[in-house]
Amino acid sequence: MVDYHAASQSYQYGPSSAGNGAGGGGSMGDYMAQEDDWDRDLLLDPAWEKQQRKTFTAWCNSHLRKAGTQIENIDEDFRDGLKLMLLLEVISGERLPKPERGKMRVHKINNVNKALDFIASKGVKLVSIGAEEIVDGNAKMTLGMIWTIILRFAIQDISVEETSAKEGLLLWCQRKTAPYKNVNVQNFHISWKDGLAFNALIHRHRPELIEYDKLRKDDPVTNLNNAFEVAEKYLDIPKMLDAEDIVNTARPDEKAIMTYVSSFYHAFSGAQKAETAANRICRVLAVNQENEHLMEDYEKLASDLLEWIRRTIPWLEDRVPQKTIQEMQQKLEDFRDYRRVHKPPKVQEKCQLEINFNTLQTKLRLSNRPAFMPSEGKMVSDINNGWQHLEQAEKGYEEWLLNEIRRLERLDHLAEKFRQKASIHEAWTDGKEAMLKHRDYETATLSDIKALIRKHEAFESDLAAHQDRVEQIAAIAQELNELDYYDSHNVNTRCQKICDQWDALGSLTHSRREALEKTEKQLEAIDQLHLEYAKRAAPFNNWMESAMEDLQDMFIVHTIEEIEGLISAHDQFKSTLPDADREREAILAIHKEAQRIAESNHIKLSGSNPYTTVTPQIINSKWEKVQQLVPKRDHALLEEQSKQQSNEHLRRQFASQANVVGPWIQTKMEEIGRISIEMNGTLEDQLSHLKQYERSIVDYKPNLDLLEQQHQLIQEALIFDNKHTNYTMEHIRVGWEQLLTTIARTINEVENQILTRDAKGISQEQMQEFRASFNHFDKDHGGALGPEEFKACLISLGYDVENDRQGEAEFNRIMSLVDPNHSGLVTFQAFIDFMSRETTDTDTADQVIASFKVLAGDKNFITAEELRRELPPDQAEYCIARMAPYQGPDAVPGALDYKSFSTALYGESDL
């Protein structure tokens, strides 16, 4: 062991007594992949971290105490690497390199690295665990490192039925606790929370230490503490867990539980070995009782097995090949049936025979009896020799079957490949000879010939591409012959037919190319003429079609200028007809030249010109149609010209009248507006003047009737515009109606003003003053004032409606009187009504009551005598008949209530 006293005087260790840990050989790759589920990318759950700290600390101290030391804080006490190296020496029983002296960080890192290198030398992959993290006291990395050490030196070698360490430990726990009620170990976390599993493990091996039947599942803390205390006191297993932590954690830390449970496994391993030995003795004793029976069974089994081997070997050595894969597959199926059905029982018999023989010999030897000697030829070695001969024959037979099947599969694959390629080739060549022999070029046009040549070139490319397939077909046929394919004759026949046909296609291809090229040259001259004809015929045909469309086009004109423009364009078109006729003759001459060349060279032209569908017949037919349409167009244009001249006369006639009536209406409207604003003279004079003006307007009505008649003629002629006037009939009608409405409204306003003046007692001067003020602020002369204009008018008349709170309130009150509908406008009539109320006596109930009070001598009632004395007789009797008796405290006989009578007159109460 390393001398730690020299490295650090703060640690006083005694002589080393390295424990026999779980260290040893063996690869850690698969083990670590299954067991080390430490997740270094995630933070530990606080509860789990707490459990791990306690458990791992206790586990480390259980080994460090063998060296006379211990740790208190797991992430602090390993920082210098000294106790970490000591822990590894104790649990491995090996010596580590000497630690470095000094307490500097570099010394600590080097010591930790020595420990980590030692762990890595045991086949452990330390992923993301570095010496710096351990020296820095990284709790997560330190716990991860200790867990890795626990896995390697405490759990790795636990194996039950070839399971991994974790699974083996779990299986061991399940088997040991299986007989116990309320215990079902399925994992290393929640299965241990109630403590019964810990107690069951102890009771299974040391029943005298635990009274299991007295434990209750609903008291987990007591159960856990009982198990921990018994384990610490009697089994020398330190207390690594807290009962409260386990119970209060939804899922206890799996690593902490595994570490603690592994201590039980190592503590009870000796007892388990004793149990195994006892079972072995029982089995030996049981076998000893059956020795004689086994001897008889051996003899019979050996005879039967040897006989079966002697019968089977000749069948396996039969290597006669078959012709088809189906036959070989049947032999393979028979062999598989032998392996599946016949041989397994014999393997079992042989195995049982050897087991019985070995068991029998062992039992006899242990019981000091002479060894069993089978009959001659029936020794185990004889059976093994026969079995080896059988397996050798079997192995060779299987190899032969597979080779034969592979050979036949190869042959079948090649044959199928040959058939597929041959079928594809034959399908491709089908009809190719007939195509190459076809003399379709003899009646083809030049474009057809060129298309046939391009098609033939494509075929030649396709033919060259298929050369590889023909060569592949021949190569496959050759390989089938070399492999002795059973149907080689048919393959060779088919291959020869394909090759002969291929040679014939090559010869026909060459002949057809020569014929196509010869025909192409003969047709090029004619084609050039056809092309020239098409180039000139197409635009000429388009010109004729456009001309016919234009000549037949329905024209819609509305002015004389438009029809004159159409006539001018038509005259210009007629001037181009001689040139067009010359072009027509030239085009027809080209066609005749092509016909002459074809006839002189005995060429049979198939169909019409390939470049155009415009034939000479079409050109002549359309030319004749153009000649017929020209005079028709002349006649139609002249008729339309006459019509437009008549329409122009109607326009001018209407315009001359409308240009008089329209301004007259506009002038009258302006004069009425001026009269309504100026209002010179008395209201009666103004009313008389306006009525005379109205009669003059009505007298003008015949002029509108005449205009209506002219408008009717325009509508019948479908004339929609008139550039000679800006006035439409609708415009005239609307203006006339507005004129009549305006003069009537103005007369009505004057009449209302007269009524207001007479009712309110307004003088003529006041009325003119009101009109002057209103007109002054009516800037747009619209006959109404807006709110701001009305406010300015009121201010000019002395009203206090300034922009303060009191002025705004007064203005709003006045606006509610003059504009009750809230239209935002104040008419002159509303303005007059308001001003008359403000400047004349108010005819109200209060005023009448005050008058009656004067007649009554300031009393609250009046008598009949007073009424008859002050009022005319009829009015006095009217009041006496309708006045109610006065009911006040100061009433006298015959007193009448003049107040209720006055309010009733104005509808403020009932009579």
Swiss-Prot record:
It is found in: Nucleus; Cytoplasm; Cell junction; Cytoplasm, Cytoskeleton, Stress fiber. Residues 765-800, 806-841 form the EF-hand domain. The modification Phosphothreonine is found at T249. Ca(2+) binds at D778, D780, E789. Coiled coil: none annotated. Residues 177-192 are annotated as: Polyphosphoinositide (PIP2)-binding. Residues 1-30 are annotated as: Disordered. The modification Phosphotyrosine is found at Y31. The modification N6-acetyllysine is found at K114, K214, K592, K625, K779, K859. One of its GO terms (molecular function) is transcription coactivator activity. Its main location: nucleus. Residues 50-154, 163-269 form the Calponin-homology (CH) domain. Keywords: Acetylation, Actin-binding, Calcium, Cell junction, Cytoplasm, Cytoskeleton, Metal-binding, Nucleus, Phosphoprotein, Protein transport, Repeat, Transport. Contains one Leu-Xaa-Xaa-Leu-Leu (LXXLL) motif that mediates interaction with nuclear receptors. F-actin cross-linking protein which is thought to anchor actin to a variety of intracellular structures. This is a bundling protein. Probably involved in vesicular trafficking via its association with the CART complex. The CART complex is necessary for efficient transferrin receptor recycling but not for EGFR degradation. Involved in tight junction assembly in epithelial cells probably through interaction with MICALL2. Links MICALL2 to the actin cytoskeleton and recruits it to the tight junctions. This is Alpha-actinin-4. It comes from Pongo abelii. The lineage of its organism: Eukaryota, Metazoa, Chordata, Craniata, Vertebrata.
